[in-house]
Amino acid sequence: TDQQATDELLGRLTTQRLKAGPGAYSVYSNDCFTLAELVVEAVSGQDLMDYVRERFLLPAGLEDTYAPGDAFDTSRLTKTYFSASDDRALPQDTVGIVGAGGLYATAEDLAAFGGLFCGENELLTDASWTSTGEELYAQGLWPADSRDDALAYGLGWDNVHMFPFGQSGIAAWVKGGDTLRYHAGLIVLPEAGKAVAVLSSGGLSTY
């Protein structure tokens, strides 16, 4: 993790006040994931990636997921370009804040991760499974008619009733992520036992 980035975040937070009490309403912020990273490291005494690998990746058999600082074959990373008319590859796209999404993974690993939310496994308790799909977006300030909104937060999810699945009563949990050049979309249908992941070097995670 980029220590300078986390230090700057903590420095900014020392001069700010909460806009509302914790849990009063639901918002998305990468800073929250970075803070979660720091909490995990402080409580566990481990680097976040070591903790994630030990507690999640290895038990789940996910062997193709890496942090930027890991030793892996970077030539496997998809090359990116400024435009279709310029064949010069850009430098490796890297996010140094691991908690905010600075991971590399194959689509297979990402889909398998989504599969952890489909059915019973040893990594998620029933309580954790239930809480991750709760409609947290409905807490506090949120339009009453929001069933088809692109954002409808769950615990860590961008949307927990994605259109058009929600219209048919099918639970659909969605998470997208973007760096400057890489984009990822994960859709999980927990009750149907299905997960799909799409990775790209163009477009956005939302389309």
Language model regions located:
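Short, well-ordered beta-strand elements
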Residues: 175, 183-189, 193-202
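Short, surface-exposed loop or secondary-structure junction motifs
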Residues: 1-180, 184-185
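Short, gly/Ser/Thr-rich active-site loops of penicillin-recognizing serine hydrolases
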Residues: 169-170, 198-207
